[in-house]
Amino acid sequence: MMGQNQTSISDFLLLGLPIQPEQQNLCYALFLAMYLTTLLGNLLIIVLIRLDSHLHTPMYLFLSNLSFSDLCFSSVTIPKLLQNMQNQDPSIPYADCLTQMYFFLLFGDLESFLLVAMAYDRYVAICFPLHYTAIMSPMLCLSLVALSWVLTTFHAMLHTLLMARLCFCADNVIPHFFCDMSALLKLACSDTRVNEWVIFIMGGLIVVIPFLLILGSYARIVSSILKVPSSKGICKAFSTCGSHLSVVSLFYGTIIGLYLCPSANSSTLKETVMAMMYTVVTPMLNPFIYSLRNRDMKGALERVIXKRKNPFLL
C-alpha cells in the first residue's frame, strides 16, 4: 500500500483487552462461545432463507444480508483477538491493519444501511399494508441492497486511503483489540485534521441520519398500531419494537459515543468496552432479535428438517 512508503514502522502492536492473566482462559472461552454463537446463528438464518421459498420476501432479503454482514463484521476482529489471547503475539503488519480497518468499516456501515432498509420495510408493511407489494417491489429491494453495498464500499475506501497517507513515526502500540480508526489517528505523527473532518461529516451521513430514520419509522409504526383497538396486538407490537430498538440503540449509541462525540477524558477501558458492545454483542443478538424468535423462521426450520428425510428435495 502507498502508506508503507510514508511510514517508518512496519507493524502495530494490539494491546487487546485489559484482562488479568488468571482470567485469560475464561475470557478466551467466553469470546469463543460468543463468536461461535454469532457464526451459527447468522449462518442458520442465511441457509434457511436460501432453502425455504416462503422466506423469499423483501424482509428476509434484508435479513439475509444483515446476517451476512454480522457474520463478516465479527469475523474481521474476533479471530485476531482470539489468536492474540492464545498466542500472546500482539503484532499485526501495517498492511493487515489497514485491511482490517477497511473491512471493519465496510461491514459496520453495511449493517447501518440495512437496518434502515428493514425499518422502512416494516413501516410500509404496518402503515400501508394494502400497498406493500406495490411499494416494496423486488426491484426496489435489490436496489436498496445494491446501493448499501456501493455506499459502504466507497466510505470504507475513503477512510482507508486517508489513513494510508498519514505518517506513523515511533509509537506503534494500539490500546485496542483491533485496528480502530480513532486509535490509529492518535498514533499518527502527521496532520489528521482532514481525517477527523471526514469522520465527523461522513459519520453524520452514515450513522446519525440512519439512526434518526429508524427512530422515525418506529415512531410511525407505534402511532399506527395505537390506532388499532387490540390490547394483545399492541403488547406484541411494543414487545417487538422495543427489542428491535434496544439493539439498534446499542449499536448506534456506542458508535456515536466513540467516533462522533468522543470524551476528552474517556478511558481506554471504557472505549474498549463500548467497542465490544457493537462488534461482539450486537452481531450475536441480531439473529435472535430479528429472526430466530419469529414464527416464519421456526416454520422454515421445521420444513427444512422435514426435507432432510428426502435429500432429493434439496
Swiss-Prot record:
InterPro entries for this protein: GPCR_Rhodpsn, GPCR_Rhodpsn_7TM, Olfact_rcpt
UniProt main location, coarse: membrane
Residues carrying covalently attached carbohydrate according to the record: N5, N265
Highest taxon above the source species: Eukaryota
SUPFAM superfamilies attached to this UniProt entry: Family A G protein-coupled receptor-like
Membrane-spanning segments: 26-49, 58-79, 101-120, 140-158, 197-219, 237-260, 273-292
GO biological-process terms attached to the record: signal transduction
Keywords from the named record: Cell membrane, Disulfide bond, G-protein coupled receptor, Glycoprotein, Membrane, Olfaction, Receptor, Sensory transduction, Transducer, Transmembrane, Transmembrane helix
Membrane topology recorded in Swiss-Prot or TrEMBL: Multi-pass membrane protein
A GO molecular function held by the record: olfactory receptor activity
Pfam families linked to this entry: 7tm_4
Keyword Membrane: yes
Regions of this protein lying in the Extracellular compartment: 1-25, 80-100, 159-196, 261-272
Disulfide pairings: C97-C189
Cytoplasmic-side segments: 50-57, 121-139, 220-236, 293-314
GO cellular component term, pick one: plasma membrane
UniProt-annotated location(s): Cell membrane
Family: Belongs to the G-protein coupled receptor 1 family.
Protein purpose: Odorant receptor.
Protein's recorded name: Olfactory receptor 1E5
Organism for this UniProt entry: Pan troglodytes (Chimpanzee)
